[in-house]
Amino acid sequence: MPKRDLPWRSMPGTSKTSRNANYSPRARIGPRVDKASEWVHRPMYRKPRIYRTLRTADVPRGCEGPCKVQSYEQRHDISHVGKVMCISDVTRGNGITHRVGKRFCVKSVYILGKIWMDENIKLQNHTNSVMFWLVRDRRPYGTPMDFGHVFNMFDNEPSTATVKNDLRDRYQVLHKFYGKVTGGQYASNEQAIVKRFWKVNNHVVYNHQEAGKYENHTENALLLYMACTHASNPVYATLKIRIYFYDSLMN
């Protein structure tokens, strides 16, 4: 004698529910990921206590929002003797790219661009390394000092550059990196991408002047030094440098 069909089978438009179906709101809808990715992106409550207690604040201590930004877009001709530019030049004003008063804090620096060679230079068989130094000038005065006056080098080689002993209290190297380009007819690499993002938390102080110039700094100016290793072949760098800063509460 055949068994009688269950009630839900006789009702039109209904189907038996699968036991393997997961109707939880936390169920993953997209493609499944591996356990390593789940562990890296685990929620904060599953991480150790030190991750929750030592989180850095969005706004630096002693500052107020909103986060402001200043960009420096320029093409640089980098030679063996070096070059310097100030990246903390901010004009006084009320805009999103201006400082309100004398004091502000540069929270982070973003450097984006590329290093490239000229059409005539890239055909020569050579390798050229370009080095960058992000330096804090604690007591700026006058004009920025040249690369050779700040750094001590062996045999005038920029790859061996270190801050001179009598200037170590004034100039502090925060970060350093380099990029390499290679010239030649065959295995050449005539350009290299530059992409760096650093948290510096540098508190800059200006005088009573409104113009954003190095000569108006009184404390903690940010300088970017650049130099290449090849003595005769220069290198070009097309860079976009952005600083993200907050105004100080002491203004």
Swiss-Prot record:
Region (Disordered): 1-27
GO CC term (a single one): host cell
Chain span(s) of sequence motif Bipartite nuclear localization signal: 3-20, 195-242
One GO term of the biological process aspect: viral penetration into host nucleus
InterPro entries, sorted: Gem_coat_AR1 (IPR000650), GV_A/BR1_coat (IPR000263), Viral_coat (IPR029053)
Biased segments, Polar residues type: 12-23
Motif (Nuclear localization signal) on chain: 35-49
GO molecular function: DNA binding; structural molecule activity; zinc ion binding
Zinc finger (unnamed): 63-80
Coiled-coil intervals, chain numbering: none
One Pfam family from the record: Gemini_coat
Chief subcellular location: virion
Keywords annotated in UniProt: Capsid protein, DNA-binding, Host nucleus, Host-virus interaction, Metal-binding, T=1 icosahedral capsid protein, Viral penetration into host nucleus, Virion, Virus entry into host cell, Zinc, Zinc-finger
Subcellular localization: Virion; Host nucleus
Motif (Nuclear export signal): 96-117
The keyword Zinc-finger appears for this protein: yes
Functional note: Encapsidates the viral DNA into characteristic twinned ('geminate') particles. Binds the genomic viral ssDNA and shuttles it into and out of the cell nucleus. The CP of bipartite geminiviruses is not required for cell-to-cell or systemic movement.
Subunit structure: Homomultimer. Binds to single-stranded and double-stranded viral DNA. Interacts (via nuclear localization signals) with host importin alpha-1a.
Similarity field: Belongs to the geminiviridae capsid protein family.
Protein name per UniProt: Capsid protein
Lineage: Viruses, Monodnaviria, Shotokuvirae, Cressdnaviricota, Repensiviricetes
